Amino acid sequence: MPKPGILKSKSMFCVIYRSSKRDQTYLYVEKKDDFSRVPEELMKGFGQPQLAMILPLDGRKKLVNADIEKVKQALTEQGYYLQLPPPPEDLLKQHLSVMGQKTHDTNK
């Protein structure tokens, strides 16, 4: 029990749902099964949310594919955070860049 005069701070959690319609798309909300602050159009495009995990944000310094400060701010201000898939890698561009460097190096 906390000592008198000391308030126990509320821990910040987020509940992460995977989209049933869009690969690698996740919706973070503050409470399990509470989508009341998520726009209706976003929910239609997201599809049936599939629970991925419940995650404490306090004390955590980073997330795998999202900026933790942006997630916290979005949860506080709008009640949700939408994580979109990373942009596709341009493998051809990478390959040509590497090949160009190798060609340039061999011409010396």
Curated annotation (Swiss-Prot):
Outline the extent of the YcgL domain.
12-96
- Which InterPro entries does the UniProt entry name for this protein? YcgL-like_sf, YcgL_dom
Which Pfam families did the record assign? YcgL
Gene3D superfamilies, alphabetically? YcgL domain (3.10.510.20)
- PROSITE patterns noted in UniProt: YCGL
Xref: HAMAP family: UPF0745
How is this protein named in the record? Protein YcgL
What is the name of the gene encoding this protein? ycgL
